[in-house]
């Protein structure tokens, strides 16, 4: 962010000479010195000095200058009506934006108009639809560091646009990163003791008032919102949640009660262990929410193929269920039963879908209502949504699944609120309240009387044209009205002789004169007075209606949650029915999948080959070999995705599946480096591997792909073997390990709870043909040269590779080979010594870290 966004030093020195308006501007820039202040001047938001230069550059608007008695200021401005895209550009550039609106009517004030910051827009607290960019949650998070070594971290998350609020305590920085990867907040507010730079890659990081993180202040704020000091039992959670609430209030501008988020009444305290845990690496590798691989999935993520939801509420709920799959068997079974019932009743499911399409995003509507920013169309959308609720409840009337029964009971259509809105708000209200015509006739007698007066006056004016034509004999006489001169009678200059004496000239045109009469002026005053009073009364009535609706915010949020769950379950059922998914059996001693398929790849590639999987307590570690492109990575991801789907409550793409509940899914799949962090592919791989080996349990699912390939072959093989043995002997996790180290297949044969699987291929005249079918046993060939040829490597290179592959003996100086140099012989001698030492190492007794240390020591002795 620019170092100075307020007045330059020279200007600050002579601030007493500033005009009142510029003094007001600079006072706001001092108060909101961490933001760009958009300062309303008439129909524009304007910025001055360094802030203007910054905004002009980012928003690509013209930089001009404002001149007054104190000098010239650089100035940039954007129209208020089209400000949102410019605000979005400033947010994307890393700025907060403080919006300072005029809070007085300029026509009613002598002197400078008062202005106040009405909202501070930040990446994590935007609520405008134009800035949110979709139905997904937009979280702001707060992170509080523990006051001592054992306190850990407190993490709180809030979606200001919906009211979703979560809090948890996390033991260390790694767990913090896992949760940030799971929720992907747009903004992270950090407290004292937290190194903001360490989380700069996770979100837009914002430092905030240290006092907001103080336990006493945080405890008071949490109790004020959520009704008790024991809602969050640990100090770390309290500090994070209290500071987050304070920050959310700060972004609302104003002061006191005007800042309060009245619709926020519930915080969900959770432990990560209550759900299937997946860190950011696993979420990316499995492509749950964003597609990042290049194996033909056409940019499609898992959430995309599952999303048959009818409304925004359902889309967010489905995303949340994938983000946080269940680990409680009863809860999983409840979702499966509900999905099964909807699969079996396609007519009801389709009717549900049709009704749910008429459901608006009432979570965000309730948020706008409670913040006093909802317009008449928002209230009409609420009423229309509440009208759908009885229809949805009726379709669930005969449901047997207990999940559907509980959702049916939660579907409250709030008859008093719906009735109020139907009586009060017209069916198709205008966008702006100032346009009038928002409140129905018959709702308020006073408004009806004013409208009657207005209509009668306008009817008199309409009749006036006919009567004056008859009176004057001028057929071309017209009665009109404009915003400057009001009502008038227009007579062409050719008919000036027919103008009566009581006409009073109001305006002269080139070919006509415009007049008024005393009676027309009197009627005009009556009409204008009635219009203004009606407009004021209509606004007053609307605000009262909006406040009454806001009082029911908690009930409407409960309805929103129920509708969201129904929509997500119906989406799961629609996908299951359309694509032949099966209800998994949860329990047993492992993962048994018959005819499993990858739900994304089968939809984006033709000829997908289903595969079976059997892993249990007797066969927990599968070593998978086979050529590149044969399907190893897809197969491993497929198994993990099926587990995730099952625990999210969805049916799975398979002929049959019996699955144990897993606590975590870990992945080390694909090569990646961290250029910005200065970490090589191998270092990133080892860091991810270390995290897996520390955190995995015997209830976890682990996917490993090509461990150790970022270093020398001997080192990589040793690491891969050590990891395999450690997982088998010490961790006990269900593991799929794809490798090109064929030496690992001997370990799989040797280890009692391991097995070999392979993907076969056949050579032909046109190259290698992949079967994409998993088979028992180890692969007998890697087909690397054939894959290179298939990929288009030039034929001379492929031919030379075959020669080298077929003649390995030449490297030893045999017939036809070159004689080894003295250096080469010396290296062989050193290598022989290292090999001898390796033979003496008891790999089974080493921890992974000890194994890495041994390798590091040996590697350091190799020139």
Swiss-Prot record:
This protein's record includes keyword DNA-binding: yes
Pfam families: MutS_I, MutS_II, MutS_III, MutS_IV, MutS_V
Highest taxon above the source species: Archaea
DNA-binding found in the keyword field: yes
GO molecular function: ATP binding; ATP-dependent DNA damage sensor activity; damaged DNA binding; double-stranded DNA binding; mismatched DNA binding
Keywords: ATP-binding, DNA damage, DNA repair, DNA-binding, Nucleotide-binding
Residue numbers binding ATP: 626-633
One GO process term, biological-process aspect: mismatch repair
PANTHER family reported for this sequence: DNA MISMATCH REPAIR PROTEIN MSH1, MITOCHONDRIAL, DNA MISMATCH REPAIR PROTEIN MUTS FAMILY MEMBER
Function: This protein is involved in the repair of mismatches in DNA. It is possible that it carries out the mismatch recognition step. This protein has a weak ATPase activity.
Family: Belongs to the DNA mismatch repair MutS family.
Name the record gives this protein: DNA mismatch repair protein MutS 2
Source organism: Halobacterium salinarum (strain ATCC 700922 / JCM 11081 / NRC-1)
Gene: mutS2
């Amino acid at each position: 962010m620019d170092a100075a966004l307020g007045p330059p030093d020279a200007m600050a020195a002579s601030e007493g000479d500033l005009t009142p308006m510029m003094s007001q501007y600079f006072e706001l820039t001092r108060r909101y010195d961490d933001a760009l202040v958009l300062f309303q001047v008439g129909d524009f938001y304007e910025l001055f000095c360094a802030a203007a230069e910054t905004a002009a550059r980012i928003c690509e608007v013209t930089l001009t200058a404002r001149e007054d008695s104190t000098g010239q200021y650089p100035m940039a401005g954007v129209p208020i009506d089209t400000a949102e895209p410019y605000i979005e550009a400033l947010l994307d550039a890393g700025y907060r934006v403080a919006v300072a609106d005029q809070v007085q009517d300029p026509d009613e004030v002598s002197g400078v108009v008062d202005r106040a910051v009405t909202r501070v827009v930040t990446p994590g607290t935007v609520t405008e639809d134009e800035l949110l960019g979709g139905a997904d949650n937009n979280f702001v998070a707060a992170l509080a560091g523990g006051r001592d070594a054992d306190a850990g971290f407190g993490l709180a998350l809030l979606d200001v646009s919906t009211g979703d609020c979560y809090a948890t305590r996390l033991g260390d920085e790694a767990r913090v990163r896992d949760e940030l990867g799971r929720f992907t907040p747009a903004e992270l507010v950090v407290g004292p003791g937290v190194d903001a730079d360490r989380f700069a890659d996770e979100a837009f990081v914002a430092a905030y008032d240290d006092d907001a993180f103080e336990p006493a202040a945080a405890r008071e704020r949490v109790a004020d919102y959520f009704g008790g000091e024991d809602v969050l039992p640990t100090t770390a959670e309290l500090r994070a949640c209290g500071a987050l609430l304070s920050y959310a209030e700060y972004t609302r501008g104003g002061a006191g009660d005007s800042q309060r988020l009245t619709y926020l009444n519930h915080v969900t305290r959770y432990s990560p262990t209550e759900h299937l845990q997946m860190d950011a690496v696993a979420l990316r590798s499995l492509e749950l929410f964003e597609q990042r691989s290049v194996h033909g999935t056409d940019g499609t993520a898992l959430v995309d193929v599952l999303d048959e939801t009818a409304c925004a509420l359902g889309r967010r709920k489905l995303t949340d269920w994938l983000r946080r799959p269940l680990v409680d068997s009863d809860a999983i079974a409840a979702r499966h039963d509900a999905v099964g019932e909807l699969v079996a009743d396609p007519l009801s499911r389709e009717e549900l879908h049709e009704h749910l399409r008429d459901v608006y995003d009432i979570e965000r509507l309730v948020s706008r209502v409670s913040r006093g920013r909802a317009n008449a169309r928002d209230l009409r959308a609420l009423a229309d949504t509440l009208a759908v609720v009885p229809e949805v409840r009726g379709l669930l009337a005969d449901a047997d699944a207990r999940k559907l029964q509980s959702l049916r009971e939660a579907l409250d259509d709030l008859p008093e609120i719906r009735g109020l809105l139907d009586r009060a708000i017209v069916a198709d209200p205008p966008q702006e309240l100032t346009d009038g015509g928002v409140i129905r006739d018959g709702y308020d007698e006073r408004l009806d009387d004013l409208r009657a007066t207005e209509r009668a006056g306008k009817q008199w004016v309409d009749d006036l044209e006919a009567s004056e034509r008859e009176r004057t004999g001028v057929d071309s006489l017209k009665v009109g009205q404009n915003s400057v001169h009001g009502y008038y009678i227009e007579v062409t200059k050719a008919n000036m002789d027919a103008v009566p004496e009581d006409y009073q000239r109001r305006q002269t045109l080139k070919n006509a004169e415009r007049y008024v009469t005393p009676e027309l002026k009197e009627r005009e005053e009556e009409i204008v007075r009635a219009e203004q009073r009606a407009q004021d009364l209509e606004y007053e009535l609307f605000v009262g209606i909006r406040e009454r609706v806001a009082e029911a915010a908690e009930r409407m949020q409960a309805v929103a949650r129920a509708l969201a769950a129904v929509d997500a379950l119906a989406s799961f059922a629609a996908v299951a029915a359309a694509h032949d998914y099966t209800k998994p059996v949860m329990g047993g001693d492992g993962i048994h999948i018959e005819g499993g398929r990858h739900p994304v790849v089968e939809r984006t590639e033709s000829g997908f080959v289903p595969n079976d999987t059997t892993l249990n307590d007797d066969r927990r570690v599968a070593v998978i070999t086979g050529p590149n492109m044969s399907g190893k990575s897809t197969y491993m991801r497929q198994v993990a995705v099926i587990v995730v789907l099952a625990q999210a409550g969805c049916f799975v793409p398979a002929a049959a599946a019996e699955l144990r509940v897993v606590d975590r899914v870990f992945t080390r799949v694909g090569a990646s480096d961290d250029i910005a962090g200065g970490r090589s592919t191998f270092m990133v791989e080892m860091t991810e591997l270390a995290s897996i080996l520390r955190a995995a349990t015997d209830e976890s699912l682990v996917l490993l792909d090509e461990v150790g390939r970022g270093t020398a072959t001997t080192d990589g093989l040793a690491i891969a073997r050590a990891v395999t043995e450690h997982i088998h002997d010490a961790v006990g996790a269900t593991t799929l390990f794809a490798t090109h180290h064929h030496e690992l297949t001997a370990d799989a044969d040797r280890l009692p709870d391991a097995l070999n699987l392979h993907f076969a291929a056949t050579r032909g005249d046109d190259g290698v043909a992949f079967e994409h079918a998993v088979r028992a046993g180890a692969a007998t060939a890697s087909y690397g040269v054939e894959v290179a040829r298939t990929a288009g490597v030039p034929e001379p290179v492929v031919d030379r590779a075959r020669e080298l592959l077929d003649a390995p003996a030449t490297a030893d100086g045999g017939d036809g080979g070159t004689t080894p140099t003295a250096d080469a012989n010396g290296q062989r001698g050193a290598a022989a010594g290292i090999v001898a030492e390796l033979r003496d190492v008891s790999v089974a007794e080493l921890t992974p870290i000890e194994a890495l240390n041994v390798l590091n020591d040996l590697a350091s002795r190799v020139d």
